[in-house]
Amino acid sequence: MISAELIELATQFLKDRTKQTIYLDKEILAYRWSGGRHGSLLPIDVNLSLTLDDLHGIDGQKAQLIQNTRQFLQGLPANHVLMTGSRGAGKSSLIRGLLAKFYSQGLRVIEVARDDLYHLDKIRQVVKNTNNNCHYIVFCDDLAFNVEDENYRTLKSILDGALDSEQERLL
């Protein structure tokens, strides 16, 4: 007879080694990558009460982001965006404001920590294989690295694109 401990170990071994299918539900507005190499996208509860109109002193940046997001949602060329500024400058608030404004048009957000950037290709594949007509902005707060950093090379590779890259629904 097999012990419960051995069954538990075998179950954990298989769970760690099997490729888990990741689904994106169109009803979920935001996800966060969690779990490292064997991770998945976990739903985030997002407060949509903050709107772009609540953000003051950054009207030029808001206008550019709104235009870029509209183009992205319409399937037109859109640019990757790198927002810089000190802590509390409103970068995360801009993303929440964009989500509040455009979620009804299919905009969704995927948050990725800097140390998980090497999973961007996996996330790109998930979006590519998802049939829900949503458009996903990948948001990474607190980007800081040097040219030798593996995360930098990964991000640059994804941003530069590949022949099979899913740029129509992932920004």
Regions found by a protein language model. Give the residues of each.
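Interdomain "pre-motor" coupling segment immediately N-terminal to P-loop NTPase/helicase cores
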Residues: 1-43
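Dynamic helix-loop-helix/coil hinge segments at AAA+ ATPase domain boundaries and subdomain interfaces
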Residues: 40-64
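Phosphate-binding P-loop
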Residues: 44-46, 70-78
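Catalytic acidic motif of RecA-like/P-loop NTPases
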Residues: 56, 141-145, 160
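Pre-Walker A adenine-sensing motif
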Residues: 60-74
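Walker A/P-loop nucleotide-binding motif
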Residues: 75-97
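AAA+/P-loop NTPase substrate/partner-engagement loops
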Residues: 101-148
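Conserved catalytic/switch belt of AAA+ P-loop NTPases
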Residues: 128-129, 146-171
